[in-house]
Amino acid sequence: MSCAVLELTEELIRRESVTPDDAGCLDVIGARLQQLGFTLERMDRGSVSNLWATFGEDGPMVCFAGHTDVVPTGDITAWTSDPFVPTVTEHGHLRGRGAADMKSSLAAMVVACEEFLKNNPNPPGRLSFLLTSDEEGPATDGTVAVVEELAKRQAHTGSLAIDYCIVGE
């Protein structure tokens, strides 16, 4: 039995995205969102990778927000398995760096949007993703910087307001 959320989560775990390195996670997610019709904008700042992806033109905006970075592994010999090799235990638990915080949540958000848009190709509102590789570190060049930029744009256009935000942590 295949599970789209598990498969995407495993793909993200395999990427050694130790803060602030994204290790290509945003490229993986961005490619899937682009296939759905999202408009992608990279808003990188220094060594931090940020992605702002939007779908739809009118109506209230629901934003999915999260991060691709993980904290450093520490002493690798203290691990019972490679932290960047996803492993499903005999009890069905997924192990790997980012499995709980928060690569599985990102995968669930992406797959939920895929299913939603498959059944609702023209929703009555807008969808967005605000993703960063700067949450586990200083957390100043990620979400904070993107929200500040979006606020500036909103002051000029009024069209980028986030009405609702879902954070999967």
Name each region found by the language model:
Residues 102-169:
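Acidic/histidine-rich catalytic neighborhood of metal-dependent amide-processing enzymes
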Residues 1-99, 117-124:
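Acidic/His- and Gly-rich active-site-bordering loop/insert found
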